[in-house]
A protein has these predicted regions:
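Distinct, well-ordered alpha-helical segments
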Residues: 180-183, 269-284, 299-311, 332-336
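Conserved, mostly hydrophobic/aromatic
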Residues: 120, 262, 293, 351
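Short beta-strand/loop segments at the ligand-binding rim of alpha/beta enzyme cores
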Residues: 187-190, 255-259, 269, 313-328
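Conserved phosphate-binding/catalytic region of the ribokinase-like
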Residues: 1-98
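Active-site-adjacent beta->alpha loops and helix N-cap segments on the catalytic face
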Residues: 231-251, 297-313, 329-332, 362
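Alpha/beta catalytic barrel-like cores
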Residues: 92-233, 289, 318, 330-339, ...
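Alpha-helical scaffolding segments of alpha/beta enzyme cores, especially the outer helices
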Residues: 144, 148, 240-254, 278-282, ...
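Catalytic beta/alpha-barrel core
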Residues: 168-172, 193, 221-228, 233-241, ...
Length: 394
């Protein structure tokens, strides 16, 4: 019979005298790590003074899950994953193909998310390029500008008591590679874009395999993808975009990177409180569970719908971050006042609202490097304080 025995005294002369604690039959794809998994499961119960039978049940399940996957120690299940499997093992004949189980395994390996994120987004490429052309400046200067934006974040940290774990940045590797390299090793939340700017249908920058591209990224870097999407788009366009997002999500599952999906409805559509909620529901129905969502300013009704949808479809989602869409500081603060009421909203990643005017002045040589850094840092601090004020209210 399948399973194991626990011997607490002398070893009997015959295995027929041993009590077998049965496990579950699975297809064996790999044998490496099975022993480690078995012992980790057993100790999970034994060290909590649970019965030997219960401890052995955990051991059998952990071993079964590891041998059914192409992996070694990283394939060992988390506690939530283990209990889900034990509750549903009779319906899970092939654990490696069970989507719910695999999702629990994926989220169980994530590092702990910051409670809040105060993000400065400067992963813009087209907007910076267009600004450089408008100001008759060599686009090569954008690289320097993005390094200065890193200094703005550092200055804001120095002037406030915010934790570095709550600091976020969105930086591209087209113009921001030096900026990215300069923050290597910092405990900041870092996200990088993969979308070709302004593409609709969605295309990935640089072409080729998105999975191959992610292989060179540090695992701590979050994959950010902006998609201009509306659930009422023409069916051909919608399916093309959805295929791209599914490909990206699969690549993130394979690479182990977290995914932030940014949704912006095209301006041609009339604003509707159900647009974003319907979009989220559509992606969840497609089996796409991003770790993060990045969403525009919304009304109370939309936030409530979004909260219900996320908690219903993926209670392990890290949360929602607000985007700015180049709105005024006052408009952004108004969006904070609404979003901060909802537990699912974890903060913001705002860009042009904080730096665009100063970037233009810098390119036109109306301000120097230090003035630019200070201006953006002060704006950034102002938004962080505004977010804190809103959260204290609720």
């Amino acid at each position: 019979p399948l399973g194991c025995t626990v011997i607490t005294s002398d070893i009997p002369d015959s295995s027929a005298n041993l009590e077998v604690i049965k496990g579950n039959q699975v297809e064996i794809l790999n044998v490496l790590g099975a022993g480690d998994a078995f012992m980790s499961g057993f100790l999970r119960g034994y060290l909590r003074n649970e019965s030997l039978e219960k401890s052995a049940t955990y051991a059998n399940a952990c071993g079964a899950l590891v041998v059914s996957r192409h992996g070694c120690a990283p394939a060992i299940p988390s506690e939530k994953e283990l209990f889900y499997y034990l509750d549903n093992a009779h319906n899970i004949l092939n654990p490696s193909q069970d989507k719910a189980l695999n999702h629990l395994h994926r989220v169980g390996k994530r590092s702990k998310a910051p409670t809040e994120i105060y993000g400065l987004a400067f992963d813009h490429r087209k907007q910076f390029y267009d600004l450089a052309i408008e100001c008759s400046v060599d686009p090569g200067h954008i690289n320097t500008l993005k390094q200065l934006l890193v200094h703005s974040v550092e200055k804001a940290i120095h002037k406030t008591n915010i934790s570095q774990e709550n600091v976020g940045v969105l930086i591209d590797d087209t113009y921001g590679e030096d900026a990215l390299n300069s923050i290597a090793g910092k405990p900041w939340w870092i996200a990088r874009p993969v979308e070709l700017p302004s593409s609709r249908p969605l295309a990935f920058e640089g072409g080729g395999s998105i999975g191959s591209k992610l292989q060179s990224w540090p695992l701590a870097h979050v994959v950010k993808c902006l998609i201009f999407y509306h659930p009422d788009d023409p069916i051909e366009l919608r399916l093309k975009q959805e295929r791209q997002v599914k490909e990206l999500y699969s690549a993130c599952i394979q690479s182990g990177h977290q995914l932030l999906l940014e949704l912006i409805p095209p301006a041609k559509y009339k604003d509707d409180i159900t647009t974003i909620p319907r979009t989220l529901k559509r992606f969840y129905h497609l089996g796409i569970n991003p770790d993060w969502w990045k969403l525009p300013a919304l009304q109370d009704q939309s936030w409530q719908l979004i909260s219900d949808i996320i908690f219903s479809h993926d209670p392990h989602c890290q949360g929602v971050l607000l985007l700015g869409l180049s709105a005024s500081m006052e408009a952004v603060k108004e969006s904070f006042a609404i979003a901060s009421k909802y537990e699912i909203c974890k903060g913001f990643t705002i860009g042009r609202t904080l730096f665009y005017d100063s970037a233009k002045e810098w390119m036109q040589q109306q301000i120097n490097d230090q003035e630019f850094v200070s201006s953006v840092a002060n704006n950034y601090i102002e938004l962080i304080e505004a977010w804190h004020d809103c959260k204290r209210t609720y």
